[in-house]
Swiss-Prot record:
Keywords: Aminoacyl-tRNA synthetase, ATP-binding, Cytoplasm, Ligase, Nucleotide-binding, Protein biosynthesis
Claim: Transferase is one of the keywords in the record: no
An example Gene Ontology molecular-function term: ATP binding
Gene transcribed to yield this protein: hisS
Protein name: Histidine--tRNA ligase
Amino acid sequence: MAKNIQAIRGMNDYLPGETAIWQRIEGTLKNVLGSYGYSEIRLPIVEQTPLFKRAIGEVTDVVEKEMYTFEDRNGDSLTLRPEGTAGCVRAGIEHGLLYNQEQRLWYIGPMFRHERPQKGRYRQFHQLGCEVFGLQGPDIDAELIMLTARWWRALGISEHVTLELNSIGSLEARANYRDALVAFLEQHKEKLDEDCKRRMYTNPLRVLDSKNPEVQALLNDAPALGDYLDEESREHFAGLCKLLESAGIAYTVNQRLVRGLDYYNRTVFEWVTNSLGSQGTVCAGGRYDGLVEQLGGRATPAVGFAMGLERLVLLVQAVNPEFKADPIVDIYLVASGADTQSAAMALAERLRDELQGVKLMTNHGGGNFKKQFARADKWGARVAVVLGESEVTNGTAVVKDLRSGEQTAVAQDSVAAHLRTLLG
């Protein structure tokens, strides 16, 4: 017997029982995006490798350790996208969407990173990202955060996520801070782990993001990034905080929040939770005003975020069990007896025409009434429409409310109207 081929480690199948809740959550997210006037953009899963090296930074965990990179038959180096911002910027430049224009975009789809799989962290994972181009004030930063807060309210998880904010300033401000941080780390080199020693010179701000408790304790005495901010970044951050306070959105300033990708400047933020163990970040983003120019476009202000959908689904299921998937089936059409199947299928098509958006499943594969009603129950149907030989002859159907058990014989021309009343 041939050996079964299984899914790659860390790349999961999502079965019908799971995708139903995903679809409801995604529908909620998309409705909110539409209410803010954001437009969807669809991007390739594979991009040229230099795109990510230039955008994310060569001395980052993503580029050094986590990217799925391969050479195609033409000898070009290609990479499965580890995040969505770089591809979105590339598309904006390539198609002339950015210069002297305002764009508010969102995308959704799989990303790929070669990490150690664990709950909430996978090698293929799904993100929903938003990117705004052409606006540089703190008001658009605030709008993105307000948009995410509206998501949490719609999903019933507001009490289980908290907002952390920081400003990492301009490129010049970070360069000054970098020198001060390196000088401090050199004085305490013996307390650093090997990863931090390596990063101390290649990308010292990443040391601030270390998960090592000893390094975190050491950093309590390190220079504070906030003390090195340029005046424009201070004003921008103060404006953002004021707007969030006016909107009633609570936040904590976390001066060690720097984000894992090199392209950020000024505003950075994360929504975090204590309800998912070690995988606490649900949504994160910030401003990246230099990235468009860095990737070959004209200087364009930009801000955005990405949200991990696997973690969001886990969080909703953990803290809001009342948020359930929409039923797969509203109406189940039962047919039994000689020559009833073609009549049942014809009636089903008429009902689909007249009841837009209603989910109707026709029984196939035969079976007596008892078996067919069991199937209707399995699919979660609220109503059954029943056709037997006498109903076909008389041009009627029996409509049965599967919750109350009440049933009514109705002329086939009136079935749609009767179902509208039953389904509300």
